[in-house]
């Protein structure tokens, strides 16, 4: 059971995260700011990471996987300019934080996660948060989730060195794709 003091503390941390990490990075679009202020990041990390949920760094999810730092996620979302009618594929969704944030902006989100335990936890967390426009799909990240597409936007969590053709084929003509390149740069590519 969460105490009022703990809830207030996390709420203050969420506000501080946006004010000190997101806004100073020139991310000022209201839908992104509102979503990041609304989604309880601490609910989408392993319990051992809750106290670090709002730090300005990637959080380890285990197995070499990370939850992107708030600034990086916000910059990617800013570049994608997700609209209210967009269908979004969130690849490597982990415990569901990014999908929850995106769900505030898009008509629907498919959260793809290959780790079955993470996928199950993501689904439970998203349901508990009232995110009824997110589908959690368990499967290989490199395969995408074609049965739910095609997608207006595809976002990849974590670094990749190349984009699998199977994923590119799931992007609508004129759709947007964003990922972090393995050397640390943000890449946004328009296909169509």
Regions found by a protein language model. Give the residues of each.
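Class I SAM-dependent transferase core
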Residues: 4-89, 97-101, 105, 118-128, ...
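Conserved nucleotide-cofactor-binding alpha/beta core module
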Residues: 81-191
């Amino acid at each position: 059971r969460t105490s009022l003091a703990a809830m207030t503390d996390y709420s203050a941390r969420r506000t501080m995260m946006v004010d000190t990490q997101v806004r100073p990075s020139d991310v000022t679009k209201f839908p992104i700011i509102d979503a990041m202020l609304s989604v309880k990041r601490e609910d989408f990390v392993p319990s051992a990471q809750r106290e670090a949920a709002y730090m300005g760094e990637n959080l380890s999810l285990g197995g070499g996987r990370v939850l992107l730092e708030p600034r990086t996620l916000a910059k990617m979302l800013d570049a994608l300019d997700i609209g209210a009618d967009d269908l979004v594929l969130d690849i490597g969704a982990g415990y569901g934080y990014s999908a929850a944030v995106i769900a505030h902006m898009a008509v629907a989100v498919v959260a793809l996660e290959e780790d079955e335990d993470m996928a199950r936890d993501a689904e439970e967390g998203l349901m508990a948060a009232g995110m009824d426009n997110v589908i959690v799909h368990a499967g290989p990240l490199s395969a995408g989730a074609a049965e739910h597409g095609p997608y207006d936007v595809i976002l990849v969590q974590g670094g990749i060195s190349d984009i699998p053709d199977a994923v590119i084929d799931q992007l609508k003509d004129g759709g947007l794709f964003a990922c972090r390149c393995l050397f640390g740069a943000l890449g946004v590519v328009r296909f169509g």
